[in-house]
């Protein structure tokens, strides 16, 4: 095992020699100083920001979203999210959580495992460092495990700030996009980062990760599907035109799309986005210490936890009243979410029954397209964290169209099934719990958990040891 990862490290070093040949290299910089991805390196000069960032480690609890809503196991059948899907924790846990999820499997060497390198892209400031050193092709190529020892530090300072700039060193924010695919995405929607206002830049740095994206090309590089715009319809049209699918559904065989977390897109369409109230206004407010010092709180969290520093800056209503409004909107979105899920789950099983009854690809094509569109719209709404607050009207409208699309699919399926001699309702197996739903799909969860356990106990310690040695060699001690 040791030799396998050592060889990979040597190969990564050798690859640096080719970085200037990369067609999308991000290595060019006005400052030749090596970027330091270690968040602790900024603790002394930016103590308040660092201490508040470190407080994101307070979110220790892991909440199992599949256990809460087993429908999602079926909706993602055949895809990694059916294995596990936990609600997001604080930035402090970004690297740990992606290592521990069953979705990344249990690779035993640099070439094994189910996921590409791109899965690190929103987890660490080491990503920007590696892209600078090896170019985009050098970073994205290969499996997720290939550069496991290089991605060590969780989401932090160098993800959103130009930490090498004089502005940052003198206490200024020096906001920056640190990944070239994000710069291209902003250009695509006519918002080059350098031309953006300070408020837009505050949202854009969050939009490096809190967005919809997909993996493209031989290297499975990250791309935002914004060529036609950022609405659910525009991105759907884009995906359809290029014939993209994330996976083929295990039950219905539909060519599926998996929305990631389009928070930036839904925020733009919501009341706050339209009024230039940005992510940091609500989630990272400026706070005043007892000595009068003002700083930006980097403990990204619920605005109601710091009501006087967030909501009360604009709203005259009481905290209790606003909490009631948000709770009502959340309940409305949840109700429509579950309605859409029931329809789409049924459509998947009915499509499976149609295949079993001898349906042809030609007969199924329009049905599968309806299922694809229905679930894309459902996912776009539910994967956008906080959409009930950011843009509840968008969520309800999009979920409504998801129900309509699913109903279209089921109407066509009723006719097709009748044509095949099936007039009784299609039976749906027990999916009342996460375990039952995974069993219905024939998933060997114990084997997956054992594989992950072995990976965490054998491979991850080697990654951490190699990262420690590299950082000791490349950076000044803290």
UniProtKB/Swiss-Prot annotation:
Q: Which gene encodes it?
A: nrfA
One of its GO biological process terms is: anaerobic electron transport chain
| Positions contributing to substrate binding | 213, 261
Q: What is this protein called?
A: Cytochrome c-552
The cofactor binding remark recorded in the entry reads: Binds 1 Ca(2+) ion per monomer.
**What does the entry list as the binding residues for heme c 4?**
279, 282-283, 390
| Function comment | Catalyzes the reduction of nitrite to ammonia, consuming six electrons in the process.
Q: List ligand-binding residues for heme c 5.
A: 272, 311, 314-315
Q: Where is the signal peptide?
A: 1-27
**Protein localization:** Periplasm
What this protein catalyses is: 6 Fe(III)-[cytochrome c] + NH4(+) + 2 H2O = 6 Fe(II)-[cytochrome c] + nitrite + 8 H(+)
Q: Which UniProt keywords apply?
A: Calcium, Electron transport, Heme, Iron, Metal-binding, Oxidoreductase, Periplasm, Signal, Transport
Q: In which pathway does it act?
A: Nitrogen metabolism; nitrate reduction (assimilation)
User: Does the keyword section mention Calcium?
Assistant: yes
The entry lists its GO molecular-function terms as: calcium ion binding; heme binding; iron ion binding; nitrite reductase (cytochrome, ammonia-forming) activity
First-level EC class: oxidoreductase
| NCBIfam families hit by this protein | cyto_c552_HCOOH, PRK11125.1
Cofactor requirement = Ca(2+); heme c
Assigned EC number:
1.7.2.2
- Name the residues that bind heme c 3: 91, 206, 209-210
């Amino acid at each position: 095992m040791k030799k396998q990862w050592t060889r990979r490290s040597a190969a990564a070093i050798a690859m640096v020699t080719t970085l200037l040949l990369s067609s999308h290299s991000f290595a060019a910089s006005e400052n030749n100083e090596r970027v330091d991805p270690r968040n602790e390196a900024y603790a002394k000069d930016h103590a308040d920001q660092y201490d508040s960032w470190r407080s994101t480690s307070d979110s220790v609890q892991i909440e199992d979203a599949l256990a809460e809503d087993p429908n999602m196991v079926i909706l993602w059948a055949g895809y990694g999210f059916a294995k596990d899907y936990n609600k997001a924790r604080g930035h402090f846990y970004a690297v740990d959580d992606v290592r521990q999820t069953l979705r990344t499997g249990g690779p035993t060497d640099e070439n094994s495992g189910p996921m590409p390198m791109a899965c690190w892209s929103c987890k660490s400031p080491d990503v920007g460092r590696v892209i600078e050193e090896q170019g985009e092709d050098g970073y994205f190529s290969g499996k997720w495990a290939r550069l496991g020892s290089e991605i060590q530090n969780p989401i932090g300072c160098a993800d959103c700030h130009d930490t090498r700039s004089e502005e940052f060193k003198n206490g200024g924010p020096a906001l920056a996009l640190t990944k070239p695919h994000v710069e291209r995405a902003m250009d695509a929607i006519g918002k080059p980062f350098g031309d953006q206002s300070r408020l837009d830049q505050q949202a854009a740095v969050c939009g490096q990760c809190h967005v919809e994206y997909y993996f493209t090309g031989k290297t499975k590089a990250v791309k935002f599907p914004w060529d036609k715009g950022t609405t659910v319809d525009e991105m759907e049209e884009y995906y359809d035109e290029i014939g993209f699918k994330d996976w083929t559904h295990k039950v219905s065989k539909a060519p599926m799309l998996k929305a990631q977390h389009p928070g930036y897109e839904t925020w733009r369409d919501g009341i706050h986005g339209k009024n230039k109230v940005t992510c940091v206004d609500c989630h990272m407010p400026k706070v005043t210490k007892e000595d009068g010092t003002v700083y930006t709180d980097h403990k990204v969290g619920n605005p109601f936890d710091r009501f006087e520093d967030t909501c009360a800056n604009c709203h005259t209503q009481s905290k209790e009243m606003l909490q009631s409004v948000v709770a009502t909107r959340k309940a409305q979105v949840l109700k429509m979410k579950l309605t859409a899920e029931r329809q789409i789950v049924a459509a998947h099983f009915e499509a499976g029954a149609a295949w079993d009854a001898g349906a042809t690809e030609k007969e199924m094509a329009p049905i599968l397209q309806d299922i694809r569109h229905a679930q894309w719209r459902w996912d776009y709404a539910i994967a956008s964290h906080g959409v009930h607050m950011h843009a509840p009207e968008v969520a309800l409208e999009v979920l409504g169209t998801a129900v309509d699309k699913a109903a279209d699919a089921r109407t066509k399926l009723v006719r097709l099934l009748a044509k095949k001699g099936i007039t009784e309702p299609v039976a749906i197996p027990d999916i009342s719990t996460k375990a039952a739903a995974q069993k219905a799909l024939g998933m060997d969860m114990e084997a997956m958990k054992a594989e992950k356990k072995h990976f965490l106990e054998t491979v991850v310690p080697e990654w951490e040891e190699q990262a420690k040695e590299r950082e000791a060699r490349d950076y000044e001690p803290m």
